[in-house]
C-alpha cells in the first residue's frame, strides 16, 4: 500500500511539521474497557473536559477505555500510541474525551495538541509479538506507565465494522470538538494489563477489563470536521 499524500504544516510554537487534517491512519489497536468508580477518576480527567460536559456514569461508575495503537505505513504518519478515553455528555449529545495519551512521534504530538487539543505527550513505546500474541509497553522519563499482553482470537461477525466518533477536548485555553470515522475488523482478545500504581494511570491499577477487543486492519480518518473556541 502506498503512503497517503502529506500536506505538511507547522503546528504549535515548536514549529514541528505535521500533516494537515484530516489524518488518514492505518494499523491495529488493542482496547480494553474498565469500570471505574466516578470518585476514583483523577483530576486530569476533569481538566480535559470542557465546561458544560461531564463523564457518563452508570450506577456510579464510568467506563474508561485504555488502548495501545500501532499506526503502520500507508497512512500520513507511522507511530505507536497509548491512550485512555472516557465517554462524556454535553447537552443531549455524547462524545469522548482523551485525558491521557502518549505517542513516540513528535509530529503526532504537535498535531494532536494544535489541531484537536488532545494532550499528547512523548514516551518510549515498545511493541512485539508473533502470530496472535501481542506485547506492548510505554515508558516516560524511564518510568513505566503501562504494559499489556494480548492473545488475539477469532474474528467477530459480520466482518468489517464502521464507527463514527466525536472527541471533545480542553487544552491551553482552547475547547475543540472534532469528528472522525473508522473502519476495522474486530477480534475477540484476552488482554492482561499492568499499570504503574503511582503513575498517571494508577486509577486503573489492579482493575480487570470488563471487555477487550483487538481491532485489526483498521483505517481511521481523524479530524473530518472541527469546531474550536477560546476559553478563559
Kindly label every feature range from the protein language model:
Residues 1-81, 91-96, 108, 208-210, ...:
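N-terminal domain-onset segments
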Residues 9, 113-232:
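Interaction-surface and assembly-scaffold signal
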Amino acid at each position: 500500500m502506498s503512503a497517503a499524500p502529506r500536506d505538511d504544516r507547522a503546528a504549535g510554537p515548536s514549529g514541528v511539521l505535521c500533516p494537515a487534517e484530516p489524518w488518514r491512519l492505518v494499523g491495529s489497536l488493542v482496547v480494553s474497557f474498565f469500570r471505574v468508580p466516578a470518585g476514583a477518576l483523577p483530576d486530569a480527567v476533569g481538566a480535559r473536559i470542557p465546561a458544560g460536559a461531564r463523564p457518563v456514569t452508570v450506577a456510579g461508575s464510568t467506563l474508561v477505555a485504555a488502548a495501545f495503537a500501532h499506526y503502520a505505513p500507508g497512512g500520513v504518519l507511522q507511530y505507536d500510541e497509548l491512550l485512555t478515553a472516557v465517554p462524556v455528555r454535553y447537552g443531549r449529545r455524547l462524545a469522548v474525551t482523551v485525558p491521557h495519551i502518549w505517542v513516540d512521534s513528535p509530529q503526532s504530538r504537535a498535531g494532536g495538541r494544535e489541531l484537536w487539543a488532545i494532550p499528547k505527550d512523548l514516551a518510549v513505546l515498545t511493541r512485539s509479538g508473533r502470530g496472535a500474541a501481542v506485547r506492548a509497553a510505554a515508558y516516560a522519563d524511564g518510568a513505566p506507565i503501562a504494559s499489556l499482553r494480548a492473545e488475539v482470537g477469532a474474528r467477530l461477525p459480520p466482518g468489517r465494522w464502521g464507527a463514527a466518533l466525536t472527541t471533545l477536548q480542553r487544552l491551553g485555553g482552547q475547547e475543540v470538538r472534532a469528528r472522525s470515522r473508522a473502519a476495522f475488523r474486530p477480534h475477540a482478545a484476552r488482554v492482561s494489563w499492568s499499570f504503574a500504581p503511582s503513575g498517571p494511570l494508577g486509577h486503573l491499577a489492579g482493575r480487570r477489563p470488563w471487555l477487550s477487543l483487538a481491532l485489526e486492519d483498521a483505517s481511521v480518518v481523524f479530524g473530518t470536521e472541527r469546531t474550536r473556541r477560546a476559553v478563559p
